[in-house]
């Protein structure tokens, strides 16, 4: 064969890698990882896969699958199982994301405490927990706790944080020999550059005024400033804490939570009509039209459903706080839906554990999940543009409580 027909494999590989094809990188990583684990498993068995040898001391017994997150992609890794004993690659454990390492440490803690459920047994097998010693679990937990503590107590120096959202999750934990519910308080905000941040996380016994007050005081002590609007549900303790610690900030009552509150106060047959009227308020093109439509909705409800009209009228100022800001960002600030999506991501991890062994493990796992989300937000696209953020801050100095504006000429109701 002449040289013109020879393939320069080294150059071919270099060319392929230069293309940065995700499929290629994923394939190369999968092949390398499989070969590495196969070699380690063969070493434990004393002979190669299916090799006849007098030195063989163990045999393969199938595989167990788990996801391995890498910068190239998430790879399905087939970990060799052995007939006697177990094999789990230490390097795979060390390379896990913070959130998965936190999950492993929490499950391992439950395992070492003797918690025995079908779900826990499956987790123990999947995560390779049986191979971890008590000292390894302790070291892993200590490292994660230090990282999470540094994250949740860091200075909030990227402000002003013009927009803030707060919510709480109820999680179960074992305390004093029984299972109790505790509240995990979470706050997010938009910094001066338009990126979302996780601002804080705390665990309290109850979602009361004292818990929220301590939470917001901690945020302020760490540097939280420039907050113009806080979006949340209408929990009395939360609203009171906002007023006490952020007196210059307006409060936006989450429209989604309010709709549920209004539905509870509305006769069931009338709810479809009332819901349509409520949605029509938010469908207006500008702040003036929103206020005018609010008046028309109240007029329409007063005669037929006076209690519903009173309920809506009482919530007026808090529901329309968003109108003080540019319309381009109304969807981001008039409800807690972005926060709820974050909560679902946290729930996806915490539901795996179910009942936590202690409060420290809650902070470890939830804190690790939030720290990863924080990094993704900071490294991703801006949540709000700089131009609209500038206009939002400027609007505060030129407009005061537009939701209280009165309309003299009210045309017919629109839906």
Swiss-Prot record:
Coiled-coil zones: none
Presence of keyword DNA-binding: yes
Sorted UniProt keywords: DNA recombination, DNA-binding, Transposable element, Transposition
Pfam families: Transposase_mut
Keyword DNA-binding on entry: yes
Biological process (GO), any one: DNA transposition
An example molecular function term from Gene Ontology annotations: transposase activity
Cited function: Required for the transposition of the insertion element.
Name of protein: Transposase for insertion sequence element IS1081
